Amino acid sequence: MRKVLFPWPTGELAEVTEDAKTDLEALRKVAEVDISQISTEKEWFERSRDVYAISSPRIPFSRYRDFLNEAKELKMIQTASIGYNHIDIAACTEKGVVVCNVGEVMAESVAQHTWALILDVSKNISRSDRVMRAGGWEIERRFAIELYGKTLGLVGIGDIGGRVALKGKTAFGMSILAYDPYVLPARAQLYGAQLADLETVLRESDVISVHTPLTPETQHMIGSKQFNLMKPTAIFVNTSRGPVVDEAALAEALENKKIFGAGIDVFEQEPVSPTSPLRKMENVVITPHTSSSTKEAFRNTYKGAINNILRFIEGKRPNWAVNREVLTAKR
């Protein structure tokens, strides 16, 4: 019987196990399921030697090839996240290991968080809250921004970006521009979006929201040059991955008021340094990478991971494969 390893934190499992009990029971009929915490790299290597599928191994990127050489039976890595930049995809592909994320199961939570940041920044909500808690009342009231009828620009229009677009169009009557070299115009139109080059999106949008995975091509794709293209009244939001944005360039743009404000949930280094300039700025709202942190997204993530591993073991094509070319090879 093939072995599946879920190294999930005990506290998280206490919340999700009851809901996922039926899914786990189905998986246990076809696989030996090991659910336990693993705390050291040595333990990861030892426990993974005879594993067929594993969820979210916490292996340093630089050690992935060594890990894969040890895990000789491994055929599937299933993340418990949308992002997969922590996994050496090239090494996995070479070894014939398919890597899957959890696709759209977190999309609604992230899209809602994106809009929470947009609205907070546009209406100075957090800023007003700080003034009130400090005993004050007066704030620069005339400097809030209405969103109705404005232009929303998306960098990436997949499951999350598409949901952000639909909310902007239906709730605020916004025009939608999107840059995504991997999406066809017909797909963008489903979300009411018009595709454009990145420069056009940045120049013409009143709100710019980033929804792209972190890859070598997207690292620092938003830097000083890109911030200089934006309107001084623009709101910039990132709920994708921190290194997609040059954080120093963002801080400089905010400090010099090249943009109106920003809402940031992801950072180049996490946790964020206590000395980060973003912690001290009034025109930025920051949250600690919590855009996907809802009970619903949490539950759906684990259910999605369990069921996708079950699909793979049963010989079905798994959902959300990142390196699809592996699936064409015989297992």
Predicted regions and their residues:
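Conserved beta-strand positions in the Rossmann-like core of class I SAM-dependent methyltransferases
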Residues: 34, 177, 243
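Phosphate-binding beta-alpha-beta segment of Rossmann-like dinucleotide-binding domains, i.e.
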Residues: 95-97, 103-151, 163-171, 321-322
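Glycine-rich Rossmann-fold phosphate-binding loop(s) that bind the pyrophosphate
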Residues: 157-158
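A short, aliphatic-rich alpha-helical micro-motif
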Residues: 45-49, 68-71, 147, 201-205, ...
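C-terminal helix-to-coil terminal segments
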Residues: 23, 93, 101-112, 268-331
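Rossmann-like adenosine-cofactor binding region
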Residues: 62-63, 181-277
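An N-terminal-biased, well-structured beta-alpha scaffold segment characteristic
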Residues: 1-100, 223
